[in-house]
Amino acid sequence: MTITLGRFTKEENDLFDIMDDWLRRDRFVFVGWSGLLLFPCAYFALGGWFTGTTFVTSWYTHGLASSYLEGCNFLTAAVSTPANSLAHSLLLLWGPEAQGDFTRWCQLGGLWTFVALHGAFGLIGFMLRQFELARSVQLRPYNAIAFSAPIAVFVSVFLIYPLGQSGWFFAPSFGVAAIFRFILFFQGFHNWTLNPFHMMGVAGVLGAALLCAIHGATVENTLFEDGDGANTFRAFNPTQAEETYSMVTANRFWSQIFGVAFSNKRWLHFFMLFVPVTGLWMSALGVVGLALNLRAYDFVSQEIRAAEDPEFETFYTKNILLNEGIRAWMAAQDQPHENLIFPEEVLPRGNAL
């Protein structure tokens, strides 16, 4: 048997090699293969949002003004969801609804699906960008894994939830006040604050904020190579190469405060990664459950007793009444196409009224 040692050579004009060389070249803004997905999608998502909030009305879909042109400001402008009658249509510009008419497409809510889908793929492109760069400089991919958490929340809230409901209409519109309205909707119709997945999400986000504050303060407190500056910001060089804080001192401090403390940096930083990422993933799973109309905790015995005994009321039963009020008052405002009219006598009132 003959073994030939040599180097396999490709054609010098191989298109893939030419593209790979150009895309992954060291430049001020890295492009990469992921950039082919990230940059166009981010451009179209942001461009669609700025266009919608500046010029496009929601009169035909929600009966609302939603653009700067109509008098909204940054907090009240939004790119609104399509009308409920359009269900889960992709609302393509050339589709049967708009038939290539850009003005009609905007009036029907086509910009929302445009922004939502390009936004989702743009976020995925950003995560792939982190994978690609980590691989290029031989880092672990934990940044990309961490970024999967906000992607999961975005996809579950803006895409999976409305897919489980009757249409895109019930997704959040892209605007500040619009998101607030959606939060009230989630509470009134799903009792979201009493959902265990929401509780885990809150614990993750607030816990991560606490960990971040503690960690930053501890590192600042245990610097042992300070300069002679008058304050913390002048007292050390932010570009120095070596670590100049004492893990041992930090460990002794927190051992005295709590009785326990992290003894190595890997476990400490993994915990800071784990807490927020797990919290956001749990929130995303909870929203997937809401897409299927899964219920939060129900304490029916308290509801029955409150209905029978005017003197018995808990914070839970008060919240249930508040949710009923949100549903009754909000449904007529939020779904004008249904022509819902609730007589005064069916609107909920607490035991105190």
Swiss-Prot record:
Source organism of this protein record: Chloranthus spicatus
Membrane topology annotation: Multi-pass membrane protein
Compartments where found: Plastid, Chloroplast thylakoid membrane
Residue numbers bearing the N-acetylthreonine modification: 2
InterPro entries reported for this sequence: D1/D2 (IPR055266), Photo_II_D1/D2_sf (IPR036854), Photo_RC_L/M (IPR000484), Photo_RC_L/M_CS (IPR055265), PSII_PsbD/D2 (IPR005868)
Protein name: Photosystem II D2 protein
Source organism superkingdom: Eukaryota
UniProt similarity note: Belongs to the reaction center PufL/M/PsbA/D family.
PROSITE patterns documented for this protein: REACTION_CENTER (PS00244)
Amino acids binding Fe cation: 215, 269
